[in-house]
């Protein structure tokens, strides 16, 4: 996790990252069930005596490099951004990937959807409507998600079908996100969005399973992730 000093570009004695790398899981492997803790963790249990506990009120800052490439193919042109968001938000259906990166991937999918541009019909595959987005850069995210896991420079690719009302097609999404341990300042991740595509940011974020709140300063923070999306 990056300190606030690093995010704001303030000088200070840098520390080596203690995060360790982990390889992505095989995407072909099926999982029979998903589960979540149903009771508070007992400190007497093995391995949890020095575990970093999650304080839902603690505001943290994560700084990172990111790349997102998004291609959406549909049977008909989208009329509104709400139609686009409804389709793209299905990217993590039956998610198999790095669990710790999933909230950040949700943000990148949301970001990519806001920057989609239609491909000229003459260039589209078999004349079907196609939309593409490619965004990359550095950013930081204020959040209340607790301590984040190691994030190494490992791209992950997702391909999902969608069938939403009148629209059906495929989503292809390639994302990379990894820790930025530099002391250079970075913009907030929300600054990379094309906000002209929608008016209600909180509502559209929720379509991607992101619960956001606005600070007194007017900046958005990621408060939590919805378990229903």
Swiss-Prot record:
Q: Which domain of life is it from?
A: Viruses
- Which region ranges are annotated with the description Disordered? 1-23
Spell out the molecular function terms from Gene Ontology.
structural constituent of virion
* InterPro entries on file: Vesiculo_matrix, VSV_matrix_sf
Q: Which Pfam families match?
A: Vesiculo_matrix
Q: Where is this motif: PPXY motif?
A: 24-27
Enumerate the UniProt keywords alphabetically.
Answer: Apoptosis, Eukaryotic host gene expression shutoff by virus, Host cytoplasm, Host gene expression shutoff by virus, Host membrane, Host mRNA suppression by virus, Host nucleus, Host-virus interaction, Inhibition of host mRNA nuclear export by virus, Membrane, Phosphoprotein, Viral budding, Viral budding via the host ESCRT complexes, Viral matrix protein, Viral release from host cell, Virion
Membrane topology field: Peripheral membrane protein
Subcellular location, in the record's words?
Answer: Virion; Host endomembrane system; Host nucleus membrane; Host nucleus
Biological-process GO terms, alphabetical: symbiont-mediated suppression of host mRNA export from nucleus; symbiont-mediated suppression of host transcription initiation from RNA polymerase II promoter; viral budding via host ESCRT complex
Task: Give residue spans, biased composition: Low complexity.
Answer: 1-10
- Quote the PTM field: Phosphorylated by host.
Which GO CC annotations does the UniProt entry carry?
A: host cell cytoplasm; host cell nuclear membrane; membrane; viral envelope
What assembly does the database describe for this protein? Homomultimer. Interacts with viral nucleocapsid; this interaction contributes to the virion assembly. Interacts with the viral envelope glycoprotein; this interaction contributes to the virion assembly. Interacts with host RAE1-NUP98 complex. Interacts with host NEDD4 and TSG101. Interacts with host dynamin. Interacts with host NDUFAF4; the interaction inhibits viral propagation and is independent of interferon activation. Interacts with host GTF2H5; the interaction may inhibit host transcription.
**Functional note:** Forms a double layer around the helical nucleocapsid, the inner matrix layer binding to the N helix and the outer matrix layer binding to the envelope glycoprotein. Plays a major role in assembly and budding of virion, by recruiting cellular partners of the ESCRT complexes that play a key role in releasing the budding particle from the host membrane. Condensates the ribonucleocapsid core during virus assembly.
Output this protein's name. Answer: Matrix protein
Q: Which species does this protein come from?
A: Vesicular stomatitis Indiana virus (strain 98COE North America) (VSIV)
């Amino acid at each position: 996790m990056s300190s606030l000093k690093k995010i704001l570009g303030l000088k200070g004695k840098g520390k080596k990252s203690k995060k360790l790398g982990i390889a992505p899981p095989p995407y072909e492997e099926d999982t029979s069930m998903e589960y979540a803790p149903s009771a508070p963790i007992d400190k007497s249990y093995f391995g949890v005596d020095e575990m970093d506990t999650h304080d839902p009120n603690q505001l943290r800052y994560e700084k990172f490099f990111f790349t997102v490439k998004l291609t959406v193919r549909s049977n008909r042109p989208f009329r509104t951004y709400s139609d686009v968001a409804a389709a793209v938000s299905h990217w993590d259906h039956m998610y198999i990937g790095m669990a710790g990166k999933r909230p950040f991937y949700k943000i990148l999918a949301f970001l990519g959807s806001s920057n989609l541009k239609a491909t000229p019909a003459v260039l589209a595959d078999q004349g079907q409507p196609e939309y593409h987005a490619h965004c990359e850069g550095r950013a930081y995210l204020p959040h209340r998600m607790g301590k984040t896991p190691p994030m190494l420079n490992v791209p992950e690719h997702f391909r999902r079908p969608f069938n939403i009302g009148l629209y059906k097609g495929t989503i292809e999404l390639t994302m990379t996100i990894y820790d930025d341990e530099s002391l250079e300042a970075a913009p907030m991740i929300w600054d990379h969005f094309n906000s002209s595509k929608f008016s209600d940011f909180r509502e559209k974020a929720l379509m991607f399973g992101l619960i956001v709140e606005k600070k007194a300063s007017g900046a958005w923070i990621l408060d939590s992730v919805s378990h229903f999306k």
